């Protein structure tokens, strides 16, 4: 296939932009089915003697993944800026697809099943997250700063709806007591086979991105790991040039911890405090994802109008209110109010965070800076769950959920000091 057409001014055409957005649709099957809903629940129930032990084991897999991503993402980004990020995007995507498919064939009754399953999952999860480093790095080249917000929003919105689409297929075809197409249910094979759905979905819908995305001229300087480390060290030494990036990443480190914890424990809180049934829990998940998808799509245009910083600030304020309402909610009705607020503003928060980072990254260093972006999202991601867990155990789930306000408030205060115009100018994107 020839090079994709570009619009006036050298910007990629619509086919390139939409192929980039479609990758969000593709990869969301992994986070929705494997990490959040189906395989994680299957693992905790089938690979341990009780759900509590299973949850502890699964959390270790998540923690190991997060530490590996935090360690690898910055250097992987620097390496990709030298060698061309497209090849690394394809490599990480295919590795995630292969490892996810392999999870299907790890049975809970085989020797060392827990170690094997968690090891394969960690490989898949790390490959997935590193792929996002290279994927996100393309955003800065897709549009000028004043249009980046809506494109990031398109991607996040499609991602949420893609995850829902894959979940719907899984619930109809694989999960019923009598799955369609004669899929066997022995030893939970039908549940493990949802990993094949994820692998196929991810691979199929990633193909346009693999075909249309191209590295900018000046990349492809050759794979030199030693030079990549030196480039990374030089960037760290000169971070004073990019002080707005540093402030933003510290702010994101905090408010993202609150966000991640809401996603991880929202369902647990709904069941433990408000007695949600499985059907109500599925409805809760759908509401969050639909709200997040619509919010990301709508607020992409708001982002381009008022700026990424203001959009993030608005979302952090709304999430703070939602957290407080959820912690104090006297009835299910008030809990649903908080859930809808969370759903509407989670998507814009994630989308605007990505678009603001894209405005702040200097040319030829996109992957490296998005490596730092991934680092800030993972290096302290255990703090929110740890604080909520301890306070829930000592006091109550309501106190635990309420404690997440600390992350949103501190993150919002640091974000308030970020100068968006200065950050864009320092990156040479004004």
Short names for language-model regions:
Residues 2-18, 214-250:
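Juxtamembrane intracellular "pre-TM" segments in multi-pass secondary transporters
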Residues 32-55, 264-281:
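Short amphipathic helix-loop junctions that connect adjacent transmembrane helices
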Residues 52, 174-200, 390-408:
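A membrane-interface helix-boundary motif in multi-pass transporters
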Residues 71-84, 294-308, 392:
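Helix-to-loop junctions at the C-terminal end of transmembrane segments
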Residues 87-102, 310-325:
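Structural signature of the two symmetry-related core transmembrane helices
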Residues 104, 201-212, 403-430:
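Multi-pass alpha-helical transporter architecture, strongest
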Residues 104-119, 327-339:
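Helix-loop junctions at membrane interfaces in 12-TM secondary transporters
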Residues 130-143, 348-361:
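Intracellular juxtamembrane helix-capping segments at the cytosolic ends
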